UniProtKB/Swiss-Prot annotation:
Keywords: Antiport, Cell inner membrane, Cell membrane, Ion transport, Membrane, Sodium, Sodium transport, Transmembrane, Transmembrane helix, Transport
HAMAP family recorded: MdtK
Gene Ontology CC annotation, any one: plasma membrane
NCBIfam families xrefs: matE
Protein name: Multidrug resistance protein MdtK
GO biological process, one term: sodium ion transport
A Pfam short name: MatE
Length: 457
């Protein structure tokens, strides 16, 4: 029991800064929305539309680079720290190449925006302008993620938290300058949010690099002198590990976007109630997601040390802590769902629907916690392909079709509206949780030599 308590303390010490960093990131999006809304409703809508396209694109790159964390954690655990710098440099090369692709996609996103049904031309122009300003921040964001993954792979999660709050503090005044046109800058409205956010990502990257160069604990990890050339073998391995994570993230984000589109014809009340419940459940999701990042670090580190039993302990402890957290957040959600809905909207119909949907959200919080922490465990074992297959099957083969049938058809019951999609979420997330646990159990039952051989690849 003592080893589980000790492991839980270590996991929470790693997870809490990640939680706070995620809160800072969420707050940046909130600030952009509020400040753009203060300028005009059209600008706020433009930022929302632009963000809905930016997120899937940038999260694809983000997921690709998540491969660095278990790689660095295992090199650190095995005492091969001299190899970390080369992995990080190749991570920067990979981030640079992916940035170019993302920037090309975002530059041409106007075709998608202008093809939206009944979209106002002025709104479309502002959304395109916002994206074309924001896309210059894509390299800064991905370079920052490489540096952050280096720190987190070495079990240092506080720097990412600090840089997140630096970004938030810089974002507010820079937004103000470019939205309203102060200090000689042009008045850009919502487009100014894109300029500010792009600048903030570069500030966060430069601040993180400055920290890494000065950190005593990383003095033995220095990038190669001169300009290291791309190493095809290392980059190929990072892509093999990261691409399934990137695709899983992409399909998860697009799932919720598709559901939002399917709900939109049902009416204002249904859309508002769905959005409130989804926004709140996304806030609760920060807890298990941050714990999953910590579990990846601990499992990778233990496997690097050559201890499969300690890796199992880290995995099981992460799951136990996650289930405890999810139970508490589910009780909180059920108990205060109406009061929470009132914070967003005071329309009685909207509040009633949102409260009902939050009840369904509380049901899936434990499944959601298990599946996301399970994903973190599998990343620690470098078993990333299974993450993609599981999430795609659970969300797109089981969850979304089930939700569609329940919400919009009478094949099983009378059309349930948004609640049908939320039952689909429950089916999808529960299926993912079961499959993640089965895969973890399969891996942990392999002979130690095979587990360590797979992890060392």
């Amino acid at each position: 029991m003592q080893k589980y308590i000790s492991e839980a303390r270590l996991l929470l010490a790693l997870a809490i800064p990640v939680i706070l960093a995620q809160i800072a990131q969420t707050a940046m999006g909130f600030v952009d929305t509020v400040m753009a809304g203060g300028y005009s409703a059209t600008d706020m809508a433009a930022v929302a539309i632009g963000t809905s396209i930016w997120l899937p694109a940038i999260l694809f790159g983000h997921g690709l680079l998540l491969a660095l964390t278990p790689v660095i954690a295992q090199l650190n655990g095995s005492g091969r720290r001299e190899r970390i710098a080369h992995q990080v440099r190749q991570g920067f090369w990979l981030a640079g190449f992916v940035s170019v692709l993302i920037m090309l996609v975002l530059w041409n996103a106007g075709y998608i925006i202008r093809s939206m049904e009944n979209i106002d031309p002025a709104l479309a122009d502002k959304a395109v302008g916002y994206l074309r300003a924001l896309l210059w921040g894509a390299p800064g964001y991905l370079f920052f993620q490489v540096a952050r993954n280096q720190c987190e792979g070495l079990a240092k999660t506080k720097p990412g938290m600090v840089m997140g709050f630096i970004g938030l503090l810089v974002n507010i005044p820079v937004n103000y300058i470019f939205i309203y046109g102060h200090f000689g800058m042009p008045e850009l409205g919502g487009v100014g949010c894109g300029v500010a956010t792009a600048a903030v990502y570069w500030v966060m990257f430069l601040a993180m690099v400055s920290y890494i160069k000065r950190a005593r604990s990383m003095r033995d990890i220095r990038n190669e002198k001169g300009t290291a050339k791309p190493d095809p073998a290392v980059m190929k391995r990072l892509i093999q590990l990261g691409l399934p994570i990137a695709l899983a993230l992409f399909f998860e984000v697009t799932l919720f976007a598709v559901v939002a589109l399917l709900v939109s014809p049902l009416g204002i009340v249904d859309v508002a109630g769905h959005q409130i419940a989804l926004n709140f459940s996304s806030l609760m999701f920060v807890l298990p997601m941050s714990l999953a990042a910590a579990v990846t670090i601990r499992v990778g580190y233990r496997l690097g040390q050559g201890s499969t039993l300690d890796a199992q302990t880290a995995a099981r402890t992460g799951l136990m802590v996650g289930v405890c957290m999810a139970t508490l957040t589910a009780i909180f959600t059920v108990s205060l769902r109406e009061q929470i809905a009132l914070l967003y909207n005071d329309n009685p119909e909207v509040v009633t629907l949102a409260a009902h949907l939050m009840l369904l959200a509380a049901v899936y919080q434990i499944s959601d916690s298990i599946q996301v922490i399970g994903s973190g465990i599998l990343r620690g074992y470098k078993d990333t392909r299974s993450i993609f297959y599981i999430t795609f099957t659970a969300y797109w083969v089981l969850g979304l079709p089930s939700g569609y049938i329940l919400a919009l058809t009478d094949l099983v019951v009378e059309p349930m509206g948004p609640a049908g999609f939320w039952i689909g979420f429950i089916i999808g997330l529960t299926s993912a949780a079961i499959m993640m646990m089965l895969r973890m159990r399969f891996l942990q039952r392999l002979p130690s030599a095979i587990i360590l051989q797979r992890a060392a690849r």
